[in-house]
Amino acid sequence: MLNRRQVLLATAAVTVGVLVGLMSNPASAQSGAPIKIGLTGPFTGGSSSMGVSMRDGVKLAIADINKAGGVLGRPLVAVERDDEARNEVGVQIAQELINKERVVATLGFINTGVALASQRFYQEAEIPVFNNVATGTVITQQFTAPKEKTNYIFRNAASDNIQAPMIVEEAITRRGFKKPAILADSTNYGQLGREDLEKALAAKGVKAVATEKFNIKDTDMTAQLLRAKEAGADVILTYGIGPELAQIANGQAKLGWKVPLVGSWTLSMSSFIDTAAANGDGAVMPQTFIQMPNTAKRKAFIEAYQAAYKTERMPSPVSAAQGYDSVLLLTAAIKQAGSTDGRKIREALENLQEKVEGVVTTYDRPFTASDHEAISANIPVFGVVKDGKVVPAHEDDVAGDKALRIKPRA
């Protein structure tokens, strides 16, 4: 039988062994209840290439963080919900994630309309929201001063008031077109984007020769294209979702009328590239991320995505990269706050002390109390569709990516 001294020594040895094991394996050191994070987007339907890519990027980041020990010693768990790109579904999901699932924050929102309809519930509950794909200019301005004392809506995507001037600068100034036509879908995203395009054109002293609207699931753009052609348009500026944008390119081919397409970032989606096929070649759009391994972080991210999801080409590289980065930003704030309390997370986001090395960029105090946009105008570059994939449109953009474009510190 062991005496008291032998028992104490054995117990101490076991304790040391456990501690060493925990130190050598951070994942096993996690304790306490999981930290629930809402994850919402369209995982089915016409916007799903964006939603699924965003979701996959988020899940990759969560896996990386949990492997390294989690946050505050607790694992992260994503509570996924498919909003189907429908405003009313997004509203229901917001209330469920807040009241039933008790999430500490929510990541996602692909569609501007869904974001605008849903995020007021998070604002009222004082739960931070990260719009990691939706780009409508008004999204982060919905609850600003003096109407609201605090704002719980953040974004790490290039807003439309960044993209629209870029599109106009590319088409009018850099390429020298003089008679633009605007084709925008009928959603909040398309119509708010159209307004931003019109403002950017007006700043150049230019007015669209034709402004046309189309609906989600439209498959024939002949009428809109004929009116643009008859008006003498020499370039088409687009704001819409991928499947319908492909019908613009296909309609041009049917009419034998090939003028360039310059539009918002959604021209990079697989639903545009695959549906338009060769007709989509040459389409140009702003991008925060192009699937190129030109930094160590991007190389690791691309390889991890390809291995995890068994695909060579991401359906929406921008969505995947921004989804990944949104998790890194949120967890940096939780770590700094030392808490999962919504107010403390918001305060930490507005004054992040730690640089966050993301896939899109390195974030160095990206937010303040009055600026909830992580992406500044110097970060996006232009991509162009070439042989079924997006590549940099300009050589200087390739160089810019290698240098990594960073938002000036607030």
Q: Where are the language model's segments positioned?
A:
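Extracytosolic ligand-binding ectodomains
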Residues: 2-10, 19-410
